[in-house]
């Protein structure tokens, strides 16, 4: 049977979409999500003060993303609305990161399957629990695949390099300053597109976005760390390294 001009098999279409999405994500600077003694720390290389990669979703739940900003921002706002409505209709304790991750997986999977263009995003959804063992971290990719991560996860174009560094230096139950040092050190190893591949980079408070889910806080447990507070914490990491 003669195939029509421009025909591509389903397998080829999936490969093309995957390659397209990966190329878009590879242009994004990495994000690290890492556990520490009192919660979960989010660290992103992000020179923008207004376009956030890290965000609170609901009480104990936060979100991090890389890729195309308008696409992951749509997912972020949809996630907030979904969790707010769930908490209003049922109980705040029924709002979980697992439910949010499943909703994102269904949305991303449907877009990847049904649309010509997939979303160019990688996402992390995390929830802080009463103890470290109860913390939950989920990584979602452009095709709706979902993975349950323990301890740490990296997303973005240089995630393999970043993950290698995290595996070497992360320790369970580490204090906040140590977790930040490990995360920043891992991000420093990665080299964003357009920058030279040699020479050690220095990441400062001006080009980092940092947030945390702190289990010691009441109710709303997400907190941003910025400005002088971040600079002071980075100084502590320098003296303890």
From Swiss-Prot:
PROSITE patterns: PROTEASOME_ALPHA_2. The keyword tRNA-binding does not apply. The formation of the proteasomal ATPase ARC-20S proteasome complex, likely via the docking of the C-termini of ARC into the intersubunit pockets in the alpha-rings, may trigger opening of the gate for substrate entry. Interconversion between the open-gate and close-gate conformations leads to a dynamic regulation of the 20S proteasome proteolysis activity. Pathway: Protein degradation; proteasomal Pup-dependent pathway. Pfam families: Proteasome. Belongs to the peptidase T1A family. This is Proteasome subunit alpha. It comes from Frankia alni (strain DSM 45986 / CECT 9034 / ACN14a). The lineage of its organism: Bacteria, Bacillati, Actinomycetota, Actinomycetes, Frankiales. The gene is prcA.
